[in-house]
Amino acid sequence: GVWLRPRYYKRGNENLFEGSKREAKNVRTNVGVCDVTTLGKIDIKGPDAAELLNRVYTNAWLKLPVGKARYGVMLREDGIVMDDGTTTRISENHYHMTTTTAQAANVLSHLEYYLQLVWPELNVNVVSTTEQWAGAAIAGPKSRDLLQKLFPNSDVSNEGLPFMGYMEGDLFGVKARIYRISFSGELAYEVNVESDYGNFMWEKIIEVGEEFNIQPYGTEALSTLRIEMGHVAGSELDGRTIPFDNALEGLVSKKKDFIGKRSLQRSAFTAEAVSYTHLRAHETVGN
């Protein structure tokens, strides 16, 4: 559907730049919460689920443990980056894939096409769950303290919920999925609940987070934070780039096959061209 998200949460007479800078700085110093419900979500189930992921992503997926997430890059047949995102192994034959908001429908169609016409032998079912789950990203140095208050019966310590880890928890009587994933470079988590409880989740996060100086942040601050982290998104994945353009060559397997692998070997793609480069700023939003 058509998603609407605030670019920033205005205070007083703030303009976009002032408001987003305040929000980003608060994430760097305290804790912030951002609505990430718009991310595409796809349930992948079946004994061949891992094999499907291994074929559509450029990196390896056959040995991902239950309760862990992994970042992956998906290519078109011509080698161009189609999408990126994290996929979590919920149980033995059950995976939860997230996609970018813009490519959610295209990725689902991509998977269905290959399962129906190219790999009909794979025993896998894929279904969109984008509208079934509401999501909130909780980011900042105080995010774990807040999470422990939200889920007092869960071990969200570094040992109990390591980076790229997953667990289920009870959010004041509501079943929740908890992922330790960061889009900002700070300690961060994503919490998902059934969409009917989305407002309830948001209100509880704001209420409990008051003692940690929580502030909601919009898409403008989100973009600023991800740029500072060096995470690719948006203009770097505009349908004209390959993994090597975005410093993602470490995710391209040299052993296994995947969609788009042969195209990456074309001379036009192996020659030096554009390169993803980080710049050190004199002042970041957190200073």
List the predicted regions and their residue ranges.
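N-terminal low-complexity segments that are often proline-rich with Ser/Thr-Pro
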Residues: 285-287
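Conserved, structured C-terminal
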Residues: 1-21, 91-283
